[in-house]
């Protein structure tokens, strides 16, 4: 196991067997749900900066570019895309929150840095958050699937054991590295509507936080996300109401979802790509395809998913500007 050579400590507080909660933007973060969830925790749990992972070894800066910012005196500085860590202390539970872009290079070494921080604090568990695209309606309750490697964790929190084989993102490598180092690991995945793939989903973020809170025992407020989720639903409803073919498709999708009786055997569960009672070709991670596929019973006039996605994005941007 690597040492902490790529970790830049900001402060080193005392923590009591913290849970490490990690999310990364990119491939495993459909509709920004996982990263939004951790960002919300940072902003609402009194999180304090703990450390940063030096991005130089792990980032392709031609893909994720640094930004130039102006200081108050008009001088400039560069903000580098960095994975940051925060600490949270409370009477009930301590946390280490990890958030940043999925690294492009040297994944094993990167994950060893995170796991070394977990070892430094004798962490109790490492839990990754993710989100995937699926044929689910935006009006329905967000489905969250949890998987784990430790049988006690599975039994205590109604999680499932992974049986997935296939491509993985950084969360899969991180969980494997942590498990190999002796840590209990778990993953929580939220399903977001494929037809609104590029629209940030506060609804899915809230669902992830609620499920996470049940496992780690923290009281994380979600009122702000829930209010944003209500607006998110209303805006998409307004847009779809002006498109009869899409309204018909959504109605059929909702009816199909209402008829589905999900149980443990319906899931192809994993740290990387769980399946919510649908076939693998009905799922797509953000960034894998230019347009996530729509499947299931279609209306008489096929829905152009590219055009719909662009229309949804333009509509929500215009609502934000208003």
Where are these regions (language model features)?
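Flexible, glycine/proline-enriched loop segments at strand-loop-helix junctions
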Residues: 24-28, 98-107, 157-165, 195-199
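Internal, conserved structured core segments that host functional sites
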Residues: 93, 101-152, 174
């Amino acid at each position: 196991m690597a040492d902490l050579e790529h970790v830049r400590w900001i402060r080193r507080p005392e923590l009591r067997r913290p849970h490490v909660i990690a999310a990364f933007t990119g491939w495993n973060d459909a509709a920004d749900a996982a990263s939004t969830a951790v960002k919300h925790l940072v902003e609402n749990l009194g999180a304090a900066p703990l450390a940063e992972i030096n991005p130089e070894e792990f980032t392709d800066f031609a893909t994720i570019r640094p930004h130039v910012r102006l200081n108050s005196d008009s001088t400039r500085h560069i903000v580098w895309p960095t994975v940051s860590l925060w600490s949270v202390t409370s009477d009930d539970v301590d946390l280490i929150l990890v958030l940043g872009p999925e690294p492009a290079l040297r994944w094993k070494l990167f994950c060893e840095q995170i796991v070394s921080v977990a070892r430094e604090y004798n962490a109790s568990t490492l839990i990754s958050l993710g989100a995937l695209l699926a044929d689910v309606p935006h009006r329905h309750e967000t489905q969250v699937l949890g998987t784990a490697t430790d049988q006690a964790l599975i039994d205590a929190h109604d999680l499932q054991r992974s049986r997935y084989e296939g491509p993985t993102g950084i969360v899969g490598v991180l969980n494997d590295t942590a498990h190999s180092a002796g840590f209990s690991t778990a993953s929580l995945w939220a399903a977001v509507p494929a037809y609104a793939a590029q629209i940030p989903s506060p609804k899915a973020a809230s669902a992830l936080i609620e499920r996470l809170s049940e496992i780690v025992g923290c009281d994380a407020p979600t009122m702000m996300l829930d209010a944003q989720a209500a607006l998110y639903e209303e805006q998409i409803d307004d847009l779809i109401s002006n498109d009869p073919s899409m309204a018909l498709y959504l109605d059929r999708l909702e009816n199909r979802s209402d008829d589905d009786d999900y149980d443990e055997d319906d899931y192809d569960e994993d740290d990387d790509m769980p399946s919510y009672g649908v076939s693998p070709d009905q799922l797509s991670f953000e960034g894998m395809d230019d347009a996530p596929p729509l499947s299931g019973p279609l209306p008489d006039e096929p829905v152009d998913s590219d055009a719909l996605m662009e229309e949804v994005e333009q509509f929500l941007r215009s609502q934000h500007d208003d």
